[in-house]
Each structure stands twice: as C-alpha cells, then as structure tokens.
C-alpha cells in the first residue's frame, strides 16, 4: 500500500521535533560529606573534631562528553545554585565523561581583567593569585575545633590550591544518552582523607605548605563521582 507524501510529512516532523528537544544533557554538581549532603556553613564532624566550611569555590575544566569538550572552564560557588547546574549539548550516545579539577595550563596564563564579570575566569570571582600570576584551583575556607564545638578558640582553615603541577583529571566510563541528567558529586571528606585537621589546615601552595596542597590535589579524583539519572 502506498503512503502519500502528505501522510508521511507529519510523522517526519514529529520524530525530528522529539530528537531536537533531547540533544542535550543536564549536569548538576552536589556537595556531600561522607556521602551525606551538606550546605556551606553547616557544622560537620571528623571523629570528635568539628569542622565548618564557610567558603567552597573551585574550577572544573575541559568538561567532555566522549571525545568532545563541552565546557572549557566553569567556576563553582557552592553557595550559588546557578553555578552548580549546567546544560551541555549532546546529539548522540557517548560512553565517557571526563574533566579537569582546576584550571588547565592554557587558561591559567590568562589575564583575569580581560574577561567580562560574568566569565568564570573573571577577576570578579577573586580566584586569581596576582603574586603568582595564575589562578587558585580550589579555595576552601573555614574553621576547625578539636573540642567538637565551633565558636571558641577555633583554628582557621584555608586550603588554596593552584599551580599547573596540581591540576588533576578524571575519566569515567559510563553510558550517557541525550536527555540524561548527570550528577557530579564532590565528597569533601574524601578531599581531606589523610590530611591532619590539627597540623595541615593551611596551604596557599607555597614552598613551606606545598606538601599539603599536593595531598589535597591527589585526593581530588577520588572525591568526585558521577552518576546518570
């Protein structure tokens, strides 16, 4: 039986419309501590030690689906929901998600004053080290107290990592289809695994505290995990 051209066109339009509407994925970045969601400013615990993270800023770079980079760099402010949700184009299924933790070496040479204020690398984000002429990768500030209570005689915490040698990457082999929702989870307890909250609470990636920055950076790949919903 013959089908007329007029009867075929509506079907073709329907399938075309459905396909175009799904040529993307959404990416959500979540914070957890030992697998439990938390918010910046909430008191957390490692054993008897109380921890309060008061600022969590970081960069992710070269976010790729399969072999194609979809975002060259994003700035994440854990107190700004908009900076933790992204839409990435994807027209066909891929089997890998990859990204860098920090700013890649090419972007790390950029001048922050050359960008508009809404750009991830803008000086407005206060992530640039003028003394080192490069970006901080992770900027995490807070307080710890071995007594188990934040508020009196707290010890300051400042984990500021940067420099090209501290850039880390991660690849996850996972099936991703257009229309999927991706959740990238950052477990901050994994970040400080093996790091002393008594003696290793300060690093600006300088010579005298560089070993702490290396520890934190080496923990980053294990601290991030991806799931597809």
What residues fall within each predicted segment?
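Sec-dependent N-terminal signal peptides
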Residues: 6-11
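C-terminal motif of bacterial Sec signal peptides marking the signal peptidase cleavage site
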Residues: 14-17
């Amino acid at each position: 039986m013959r089908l007329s051209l007029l009867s075929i066109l509506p079907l073709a339009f329907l399938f075309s419309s459905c396909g175009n509407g799904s040529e993307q994925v959404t990416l959500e970045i979540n914070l957890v501590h030992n697998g439990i969601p938390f918010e910046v400013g909430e008191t957390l615990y490692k054993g008897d030690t109380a921890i309060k993270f008061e600022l969590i800023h970081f960069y992710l770079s070269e976010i790729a689906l399969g072999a194609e980079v979809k975002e060259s760099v994003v700035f994440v402010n854990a107190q700004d929901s908009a900076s933790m949700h992204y839409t990435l184009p994807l027209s066909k299924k891929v089997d890998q998600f990859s990204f860098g933790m920090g700013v890649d070496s090419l972007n790390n040479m950029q001048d922050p004053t050359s960008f508009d204020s809404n750009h991830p690398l803008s000086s407005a984000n206060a992530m640039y080290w003028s003394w080192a002429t490069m970006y901080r990768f992770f900027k995490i500030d807070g307080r710890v107290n071995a007594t188990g209570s934040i508020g009196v005689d707290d010890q300051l915490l400042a984990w500021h990592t940067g420099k090209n040698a501290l850039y880390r990457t991660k690849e996850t082999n996972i099936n991703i289809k257009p229309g999927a929702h991706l959740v990238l989870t950052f477990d901050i307890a994994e970040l400080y695994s093996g790091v002393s909250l008594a003696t290793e609470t300060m690093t600006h990636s300088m010579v005298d505290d560089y070993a702490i920055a290396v520890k934190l950076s080496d923990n980053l790949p294990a601290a991030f995990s991806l799931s597809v919903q």
